[in-house]
Amino acid sequence: MLGHKSMKIMYPIVGTIHERKLKIELNLKFQRLTAFFPMEIATRGGRMVRQYKVVIDFSNMKTIYQTTTADNCCALVIPLETPPQYYWKSPNIRSTFSDETKNWSFTESWSRATDVIEEAGLPMKFPVTLHADFKDCNFVDIGRWTTLRFVLNTSTEEARAANNQIVSALDDFNITTQVHDSFQFTHGVQPEMWKHLKRQVPIEGQKASQMLDYSLDSVVHLSFEVRYQLEVCISRGHLNEHTITKEFLDTIANMSPTKAKLHLEFAADKALRLADPMNLFQRYREEGFVPISRIPPYCGLVRKVVITPTTIRYTTPNMEMSNRVMRKYKHIEDRFLRIQFTEELEKGRIAVNKDQNDEIYKRVLRTMYKGIRIGDRVYEFLAFGNSQLRVNGAYFFCPTQHTSCDDIRRWMGQFSHIKVVAKYAARLGQCFSTTRELRGISSPETRHIPDIERNGYCFTDGVGKISSFLAQLIVEDMTLDVFAKPSAFQFRMGGCKGILAVWPNDAKSMEVHVRESQKKFESNSKGLEIIRCASLATATLNRQTITILESLGVPTRSFTDLLDQQLKSYELAMQDNDVAIDMLTKFTDEQKTHVHLANLVRADFRTKDLQEPFVVNVLKLWRAWSLKMLKEKARIQ
């Protein structure tokens, strides 16, 4: 969509290919619109016609525009906020059968598609980028071209009735249809803005002579921070790449990089959707924008990239707590990327162990091997921590003349003795734990002490000692608001990890006692890094302790009686303020949210005469969360 009533047609699919026709299917039960279309592709065995389908959820459709074509046909224009899901049909249905499963559905013959292109293996040769300029005449950018136009047959009375039925059914689901006979359509080519931006360096499969296609007079040079923020606005839909002109690019290029970046950050922060990019400068003057003014020493600006099956989305640099690697290479922090693989619109994780997602797995493989291209930079895979692994993420790095990914990994430590792939990745991720370095102390005095073992069991696995003096320094450096000094700290120090217990009798002055079980690898980094401190918590039972107590002879009835008593207390707390205050102050959380909620109840925000909606709803949320913890972790008091 170029505007409210304007659309650029990038690729038309017309008529019939090898007796395979276009078809639309409306499924009211699953609330989705499906369009089937054929495409001719080239494979190793020759050329063939592949059947595709695009599935559009009703939740992705807000408004439909109905127009009339020059030959009096009805056309439906469907603009989508996010890319729909594309599938291709397997030509060999028998290959989708499996001996391991007893059930088979016809949907299993359809596999997810990440590209619609004539040469199927072409994308695997290039890095993942926002603007894919493949030299393929049948390439359809399904991640960026998110407006679909369907020209419906109106030659017969039956066809016209079916068209009206589609519009009426969509209207029942609050998808309004607006009739616009003045809707404008233009047949366009690739956006002009990419021709004016500085050309990328030649990569594998690309000839250097292609860089001479454009004259130097038409090239607009943008600094990387401005180029990155521009792609943030384009990938998020704040600016339309088809409406960005050379005038707009020249305007931001003539600004200072800081000022140009602020204008683009303003568009992303306000979530603007500008049909005319030149309006950005007027909106900025009228509303203004206040960026992040001060970054604490233990934080840094992190650029995040979300890779979906069909496109890529960039995020404005955000302030986050740093890690050991980011602190070491703070002078080139803009060369780090934190990436995450998700479904479309970040709806969740990509499903694993699903044969229909092979193309999505190939896209992940392409990202890991070929990298991510932003401007003239190509970011390569570096490593991932445990927290990134849980959300399907990783860290990428763009090499410089003096620093490569291998150089960073060598600085992180010696991992050559680790032969298990999973353990190797986990040890690399140990350096990416979010930590706070103890300032003013480059390296504490480290003493190695043995583990305590009895009958083949290690009773001190991962537990070292720290002096009370160092513990006090940590409390002051982290400005902890605590009533009692923490008794233990979760830490990282070089290749060591685990917890350090405050031990005044053994650890003196600046000493840290590390056990052999805490040492995972050798590293040149010796600074003490703290992840979190011990805090007060309410002692409860859990599934593990219940299992142990039952094996020691405690009857199960004892636990069920305690559980019933606690459930009755939660129900009574929704009626009796005294019971609610008692339970809220007894089961407190680290953020002291329960204490604040108890103060609201104590201040008569919930009485027989006054039921303040916010307090009542938060109390219901507290009860639901507590019951969830009882069900999942058996936290019985």
Kindly label every feature range from the protein language model:
Residues 1-74, 79-122, 128-146, 151-181:
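N-terminal recruitment modules of adaptor/scaffold proteins
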